[in-house]
From Swiss-Prot:
One of its GO terms (biological process) is symbiont entry into host cell. Minor protein of the capsid that localizes along the inner surface of the virion, within the central cavities beneath the L1 pentamers. Plays a role in capsid stabilization through interaction with the major capsid protein L1. Once the virion enters the host cell, L2 escorts the genomic DNA into the nucleus by promoting escape from the endosomal compartments and traffic through the host Golgi network. A motif (Nuclear localization signal) lies at residues 1-10, 510-517. Signal peptide: none annotated. InterPro entries: Late_L2 (IPR000784). Pfam families: Late_protein_L2 (PF00513). Disulfide bonds join 19-25. It is found in: Virion; Host nucleus; Host early endosome; Host Golgi apparatus. Keywords: Capsid protein, Cytoplasmic inwards viral transport, Disulfide bond, DNA-binding, Host endosome, Host Golgi apparatus, Host nucleus, Host-virus interaction, Late protein, Microtubular inwards viral transport, Phosphoprotein, Viral penetration into host nucleus, Virion, Virus entry into host cell. This is Minor capsid protein L2.
């Protein structure tokens, strides 16, 4: 069994002050404060018959009483043939008598006609200033600087003398240039250039070095400062998932907490539990009680009261809402399984008395929607990630250009139609409508495209998902057709066409009633 902790009692003086008026003071407290203990009585009554005044007890004089002090470790000592000498400390005699009387000078009366100004020379006050104090001042001469020889020019002519004074030399000025660069994570440096003197990098900082060697200023490095590593722009932090929430609106008031604690909708002994599967229970629950029209401007977020005539009886759209006279506002909560529950408390008017009072049970209509789970962390992918290697392409070295005037039309000149110069291919190759396919493996996939005979120009596109595509914009100019006249030849050549080809005029084509081609 553990012993009880001992509580320290209050001081005797404080206990006596508080309990004296009530008369409940303990006897030991009263005896100690009023000095009526056994020891106090012995000293009080014993001092009347015994006198200890000559011993010096409690006098504070330090004389040791009538016998004096005895050194430690020695006896009192006995001297043969004489009286022992008592060793006493020396005391300063205190003179007892009247205090010395100091004479006070009498002050002569001041005449009314005398001046109130007292000259300083007539002041009889004591000199409060100290006497003469010897002051020693040490004078240090200023060191002489370097002498500058200035040439002096003297003339003996009658004109004014001109003295040429050389300017003082200006001391060299020390200049210190500092540069500070701040890291901007939203700006990324991408350097691509031709190989030249220096080095380039794709990191956050660019260091360009040239020349041979350098010079260190400040001597050897004696102190090393520990640097803090800043996170790179490719690193990111993954936040921990938030704890599971109990409701979508966690704000709770005191009134709602008291109401929930006093009355529970899930009490099956007092409230009937009805699960509703109709989606109208969330938006327009009144349509489940009676037939009504739609009002898009009205939101049923309040308590609905339904009045019904006694003589008339209407079947509700939903049998679960039979005889409902009042349907409360929606309440949101969570179930033990973690689902969101929308609840409405309804009151039935099953029995009606002659006085007009309706009696009915209370019904709890509810519907479970979904659960509120914790957010799973989403792993983000890096956009624009590269290996750090730069590709440098020098166009003038790897390409060949031919100086050719494309705007010049070779057919615009007067050239003989039978000349062999027309057979030369002097046109510029145009690959604007072509497609470049580069495969990444040796075995390529072959596609068989059926070919149909038709007069129309057909275009086929084959999609290869294993390669790379290079697409260029395509632009075509529509040229107006010039119809021939009797003065024009059968073959019409347009000088605006740079391709150098020709086509047959539509009027010279064969006319057939049935179409052979699609």
């Amino acid at each position: 069994m553990a012993r009880a902790r001992r509580v320290k009692r209050d001081s005797v003086t404080h206990i006596y002050q508080t309990c004296k008026q009530a008369g409940t003071c303990p006897s030991d407290v009263v005896n100690k404060v009023e000095q009526t203990t056994v020891a106090d009585n012995i000293l009080k009554y014993g001092s009347a018959g015994v006198f200890f005044g000559g011993l010096g007890i409690g006098t504070g004089r330090g004389t040791g009483g009538a016998t004096g002090y005895v050194p430690l470790g020695e006896g009192p000592g006995v001297r043969v043939g004489g009286t022992p000498t008592v060793v006493r400390p020396s005391l300063v005699p205190e003179a007892i008598g009247p205090v010395d009387i100091l004479p006070i000078d009498t002050i002569a009366p001041v005449e009314p006609t005398a001046s109130s100004l007292v000259p300083l020379t007539e002041s009889s006050g004591a000199d409060l200033l100290p006497g003469e104090v010897e002051t020693i001042a040490e004078i240090h001469p200023i060191p002489e600087g370097p002498t500058i020889d200035s040439p002096v020019v003297t003339t003996t002519t009658g004109s004014s003398a001109v003295l040429e004074v050389a300017p003082e030399p200006v001391p060299p000025t020390r200049v210190r240039i500092a540069r500070t660069q701040y890291h901007n994570p939203s700006f990324q440096i991408l350097t691509e250039s031709t190989p030249a003197q220096g080095e380039s990098s794709l990191a956050d900082h660019i260091l360009v070095t040239s020349g041979s060697g350098g010079q260190r200023i400040g001597g050897d490095i004696t102190d090393e400062i520990e640097l803090t590593e800043f996170p790179s722009r490719y690193t990111f932090e993954i936040e921990e998932p938030t704890p599971p929430r109990k409701s979508s609106t966690p704000l709770q008031t005191v009134a709602s907490a008291v109401r929930r604690r006093g009355f529970s909708l899930t009490n099956r002994r007092l409230v009937q539990q009805v699960a509703v599967d109709n989606p109208l229970f969330l938006s327009q629950p009144s349509k489940m009680v009676r037939f009504s029209f739609d009002n898009p401007a009205f939101e049923e977020e309040v308590t609905n009261i339904f009045e019904q005539d006694v003589n008339s009886f209407e079947e509700p759209p939903d049998r679960d809402f039979l005889d409902i006279k009042q349907l409360g506002r929606p309440q949101y909560s969570t179930t033990p399984a973690g689902y969101i529950r929308v609840s409405r408390l309804g009151t039935r008017g099953t029995i009606r008395t002659r006085s007009g009072a309706q009696i009915g049970s209370q019904v709890h209509f509810y519907r479970d929607l979904s659960s509120i789970n914790t957010e799973d962390p989403i792993e983000l992918q890096l956009l624009g990630q590269h290996s750090g290697d730069a590709t440098i392409v020098q166009g003038p070295v790897e390409s060949t250009f031919i100086d050719m005037d494309i705007a010049e039309n070779p057919l615009s000149e007067t050239i003989d139609a039978s000349s062999n110069d027309l057979l030369l291919d002097e046109t510029v190759e145009d690959f604007s409508g072509s497609q470049l396919v580069i495969g990444n493996r040796r075995s390529t996939t072959s596609y068989t495209v059926p070919r149909f005979e038709t007069t129309r120009s057909s275009s086929y596109y084959v999609q290869d998902t294993d390669g790379y595509y290079v697409a260029y914009p395509e632009s075509r100019d529509t040229i107006d057709i010039i119809y021939p006249t009797p003065e024009l030849p059968v073959v019409v050549i347009h000088t605006h066409d740079n391709s150098g080809d020709f086509y047959l005029h539509p009027s010279l084509r064969r006319r057939k009633r049935k179409r052979k081609y699609l």
